[in-house]
UniProtKB/Swiss-Prot annotation:
GO cellular component: host cell endoplasmic reticulum-Golgi intermediate compartment; host cell plasma membrane; host cell rough endoplasmic reticulum; host cytoskeleton; membrane; viral outer capsid
InterPro entries (UniProt xref): ConA-like_dom_sf, Rota_A_VP4, Rota_VP4_MID, Rota_VP4_MID_sf, VP4_concanavalin-like, VP4_helical
UniProt xrefs under SUPFAM superfamilies: Concanavalin A-like lectins/glucanases, VP4 membrane interaction domain
Motif (KID motif): 644-646
Keyword Lyase assigned: no
Organism encoding this protein: Rotavirus A (strain RVA/Pig/Mexico/YM/1983/G11P9[7])
Top-level taxonomy: Viruses, Riboviria, Orthornavirae, Duplornaviricota, Resentoviricetes
Stretches the record annotates as Hydrophobic: 389-409
Disulfide bonds: 203-216, 318-380
Name of the protein this chain belongs to: Outer capsid protein VP4
Region span, Spike head: 65-224
Keyword match Coiled coil: yes
Coiled coil, from the record: 484-518
Length: 776
């Protein structure tokens, strides 16, 4: 059978990995690598580890531990801890608001009996009685008075092993530390005009922001980090903390290095990125209540903006990756609203924006290093899209929000019909937010992400601002253009080739002779006979087959087989562990949702249509796994593909893998499969439709989903080449025997050929309809 080609592609995909491995080993053994650093390597040894480059940034990053600074008198900023690191005993800091608070801190060495000592406090000699009963720890005491002529009182001692102390002005109070390390805590003194309190430090000190108070407490209790305790750390003047205000030129060109022929230029640029999403909405056939696809697609946007008085023309191309496929099925009736697939971007998705402008930075963007960029975030909120039904209220998909966060930048190329542009690709990761999206008049609600229905929400564009910096190797003569690696500057875009090839393939459907098609569908086509219509050597044919398998193993069909294999493995292991589970021959089989059925028997599907649709997803895979003598949809699909490949004038080795994979997924989308049990036939379609009938009368009978599931497991699955509608029409107009009905139900190729040779218009019309569904 012609569908042997698809089965070979499914079973032989492992050869792709083997081929890649052999190719890599051969390349590694055969390649000679010569490293010539050149005059721009910064060092005579290769390979060169290039740095990140300079990016002008107005954002100030506040250090955790700022200092040490030399002793001085200053007005500490509020909400900042002044961490004192004294080396000898005595007064370490004092401060006053000159009104009602004079406060000083004194350090006393260990093991001091009660004694009188004289200290210089605020320019006066003051005698105080002090002591330190600890044998190992140093003692900090606060002394304060509330009037200029009053007496000092002692407060809040701190016994410290690291010999560190801290003070902070905040919220009308002066905060200090007290207690015993390593369990010291903060205390405070109330004061008026606290923000005007000047302090004099008599030892080195550090500055720590209040939001890092936990770190400050850690230092008080356990000491400074080791790097601060080396002799190489030298205190500097507090004036070093002052900011010199200069006007930065963000948009500038800097010559990094230069020789007679080449120079390295660093380009720093402000950029404004404007972009928008595009989508494809495809309505399914029928009465107008079904939609087959709502998906994102790339779009290029051209705009102008002003940068430092210069008008810039820019291009952006926006695309998405890692989309999530959702679907909605309102029921099995032709008038039930349904969406086969609609795409949503969420946290696991990425947005790519390729940016190019007509400035000097992009003119020679071929050899680039030290590429860096800083961009803002942007929030994208979806709008509303109404599904215009022939009758009744319109369902409306509305809402959805994602925020784009910059996640990297790389070099890329934007392709147009006439020129290829070296550009930058900005990658954005996503987070979801409110509002969620929903479809009115359905149960779809409170879902998060941005659906493809109306991602721009009537906006002309979204906008992101930021900066970029890069170093580019360019000719020393500015009039020269950097030579490009290849000589072809205008590239035939692969997507454009595929578009033209799809149009050609679809037009060739009229030229296929049905009798030849049936014969071709019965041939055991393998991969090489399938592709023999392309003029190429044997080696090229082998390479082509490998390329087809590389692409095919990423197809939806191959992914479904892989998922099914995993599910069967899970089922086998689960059955062996549980004696309460029914055998795999029952409806909880690999051809239903086996892993779900095994792990949660109590969970059942609510409606017959949903159960049937769940099983129907597996029917094609079951048919591939259990080949019968009858003809199937894949036989016709492969035969049509072979015929069109032979007739095509545009097929090439580069487009063939895409075409073969796309054909396996999109040819004959409206498939119905059947199983036969004596005189009863059960049919289920990929669209969720299901029915049962008797062979002799074609009268419908109640559909037993449990019986259908059991039959799918135990009986062969047959492609409904001749559907029930055609069979009824054939019986009413020509009359057929029960045996002929059985043969047509089994898709017997011999009987089909007889009807076609007899020019039976009903059978011919059905086969022609299937051929016309073989579209890309």
């Amino acid at each position: 059978m012609a569908s042997l080609n698809y089965r070979q592609l499914l079973t032989n995909s492992y050869t792709v990995n083997l081929s890649d491995e052999i190719q890599e080993i051969g390349s590694a053994k055969a390649q000679n690598v010569t490293i010539n650093p050149g005059p721009f390597a910064q060092t005579g040894y290769a390979p060169v580890n290039w740095g990140a480059g300079e990016t002008n940034d107005s954002t100030t990053v506040e250090p955790l531990l700022d200092g040490p600074y030399q002793p001085t008198t200053f007005n500490p900023p509020t909400s900042y801890w002044v961490l004192l690191a004294p080396t000898v005993e005595g007064v370490i800091i004092q401060g006053t608001n000159n009104t009602d608070r004079w406060l000083a801190t004194i350090l006393i060495e260990p093991n001091v009996q009660t004694t009188n000592r004289t200290y210089n406090l605020f320019g006066q000699q003051v005698t105080l009685s002090v002591d330190n009963t600890s044998q190992t720890q140093w003692k900090f005491i606060d002394v304060s008075k509330t009037t200029l002529t009053g007496n000092y009182t002692q407060h809040g001692p701190l016994f410290s092993t690291p010999k560190l102390y801290a003070v902070m002005k905040f919220s009308g109070r002066i905060y200090t530390y007290n207690g015993t390390t390593p369990n010291a805590t903060t205390g405070y003194y109330s004061t008026t005009n606290y923000d005007t309190v000047n302090m004099t430090s008599f030892c080195d000190f550090y500055i720590i922001p209040r939001n890092q108070e936990e770190k400050c407490t850690e230092y008080i209790n356990h000491g400074l980090p080791p790097i601060q305790n080396t002799r190489n750390v030298v205190p500097v003047s507090l004036s070093a903390r002052e900011i010199v205000h200069t006007r930065a030129q963000v948009n500038e060109d800097i010559v990094v290095s230069k020789t007679s022929l080449w120079k390295e230029m660093q380009y720093n640029r402000d950029i404004t990125i404007r972009f928008k999403f595009d989508r494809t909405i495809i309505k399914a056939g029928g009465l107008g209540y079904k939609w087959s696809e709502i998906s994102f697609k790339p779009i290029t946007y051209q705009y102008t903006y002003t940068r430092d008085g210069e008008q810039i023309t820019a291009h952006t191309t926006c695309s998405v990756n890692g989309v999530n496929n959702f679907s909605y099925n309102g029921g099995s009736l032709p008038t039930d609203f349904a969406i086969s697939r609609y795409e949503v971007i969420k946290e696991n998705s990425f947005v790519y924006i390729d940016y190019w402008d007509d400035s000097q930075a992009f003119r020679n963007m071929v050899y680039v290093r030290s590429l860096a960029a800083n961009l803002n975030t942007v929030t994208c909120t979806g709008g509303s899209y109404s599904f215009a039904l022939p009758l009744g209220n319109y369902p409306v998909m509305t809402g959805g929000t994602v925020t784009l966060h910059p996640a990297g930048v790389t070099l890329s190329t934007q392709f147009t019909d006439f020129v290829s542009l070296n550009s930058l690709r900005f990658r954005f990761r996503l987070t979801v937010g409110e509002p969620s999206f929903s479809i009115t008049r359905t149960r779809v609600s409170r879902l998060y992400g941005l659906p493809a229905a109306n991602p721009n929400n009537q906006r002309e564009h979204y906008e992101i601002s930021g900066r970029l910096s890069l170093i580019s190797l360019v000719p020393s003569n500015d009039d020269y253009q950097t030579p490009i690696m290849n000589s072809v500057t205008v590239r035939q875009d692969l997507e454009r080739q595929l578009g033209e090839l799809r149009d050609e393939f679809n037009s060739l459907s009229q030229q296929i002779a049905m009798s030849q098609l049936i014969d071709l569908a019965l041939l055991p086509l393998d991969m090489f006979s399938m592709f023999s219509g392309i003029k190429s050597t044997i080696d090229a044919a082998k390479s082509m087959a490998t390329n087809v398998m590389k692409r095919f193993k990423r197809s939806n069909l191959a992914s479904s087989v892989s998922t099914l294999t995993d599910a069967m493995s899970d089922a086998a292991s689960s059955i062996s562990r549980s004696s309460s589970i029914r055998s795999i021959g029952s409806s909880a089989s690999a051809w239903t949702e086996v892993s779900t059925s095994i792990t949660d028997i109590s969970t059942t599907v609510d409606t017959v249509s949903t159960q049937t649709a769940t099983i129907a997803k597996r029917l094609r895979l079951k048919e591939i796994a259990t080949q019968t003598d009858g003809m199937n949809f894949d036989d016709i699909s492969a035969a049509v593909l072979k015929t069109k490949i032979d007739k095509s004038a545009q097929i090439t080795p580069s487009t063939l893998p895409e075409i073969v994979t796309e054909a396996s997924e999109k040819f004959i989308p409206n498939r119905t499969y059947r199983v036969i049990n004596n005189d009863e036939v059960f049919e289920a379609g990929m669209d969720g439709k299901f029915f049962a009938y008797r062979v002799d009368t074609f009268d419908e009978i109640p559909f037993d989903v449990q019986k259908f599931a059991d039959l799918v497991t135990d009986s062969p699955v047959i492609s409904a080449i001749i559907d029930l509608k055609t069979l009824k029409n054939l019986k009413d107009n020509y009359g057929i025997s029960k045996q002929q009905a059985f043969d047509l139900l089994r898709s017997d190729p011999k009987v089909l050929r007889e009807f076609i040779n007899q020019n039976n218009p009903i059978i011919r019309n059905r086969i022609e309809n299937l051929i016309m569904q073989c579209r890309l």
